Amino acid sequence: MRRPAPYHRVAAIMTILSLAGAGHQARLDARGGMLTGPTANLAPGHVQANLAILPQAVAGDFLRFCQRNPKPCPLLAVSEPGDPSLPELGLDIDIRTDVPRYRVWRDGKLVDEPLDVRGLWRDDLVAFLIGCSFSFEEAMLENGLPVRHIEQGCNVPMYRTNIATHPAGPFSGPLVVSMRPLKAADAIRAIQVTSRFPSVHGAPVHLGDPALIGIADLGRPDYGDAVEIRAGEIPVFWACGVTPQSVVAAVRPEFCITHAPGHMLVTDLLNSRLAAF
């Protein structure tokens, strides 16, 4: 007769299933058109991912681009050509429907922002899922660090910089950064906290004067929403997974699909599993 599993094992399994269910529910909401906005602080504890979908003919070059630029493009998963599933990231993922909002690019021009891309799917498309800073924000909040765009209920501000990425094949372009304002002491703590998560951008790439990295006006982000910067705070900048979108605009591949900035794929992976130490 098979003996029942010890209580602690059953409890652990149920906890894992419950946590995975939160990510799965977020994807179902996106798939059903009920989730169409930014995903910051959604399904707490879950890894979120940026998306870039490209034809197989240029997928190898883009893979090398990600490998050469691990700060803005830390790869979490790569699909098989034509396969919209990503079983390593979660139950029943369909990358054509499970992102709240997509961007469609043709010859480097943004032509649409649909809620699903089933009608555009092709057998030669390869999906790249890239780590997102929304994942380390959980650790920031747990350490008592403020995250302004969550406080204000808006999207994180993102900016194109004058920092060049390392090219691979046709892919090259400017680094995009996300910004969170912090007091100096909190910025030091944020460096310590986010350094533990290299697979979701890790430590900041710059803090202080935005002009040094080519940002003229923090009140006019290239992507996302401007946030309040209070007295005594400095802007802190992290490499951002929207970088491929600035590269797409520069390189102009014939076809590409990305997520809309701030509108991520919510996975079943847990943020705690990404901590390097």
UniProtKB/Swiss-Prot annotation:
Gene3D superfamilies: PSTPO5379-like (3.40.1640.10), PSTPO5379-like domain (3.30.2040.10). It is an enzyme of class 4 (lyase). Pfam families: D-Glu_cyclase. The keyword Aminoacyl-tRNA synthetase does not apply. Keywords: Lyase. Its EC number is 4.2.1.-. GO terms for molecular function: lyase activity. Belongs to the D-glutamate cyclase family. This is Putative hydro-lyase BP1875. It comes from Bordetella pertussis (strain Tohama I / ATCC BAA-589 / NCTC 13251). The lineage of its organism: Bacteria, Pseudomonadati, Pseudomonadota, Betaproteobacteria, Burkholderiales.
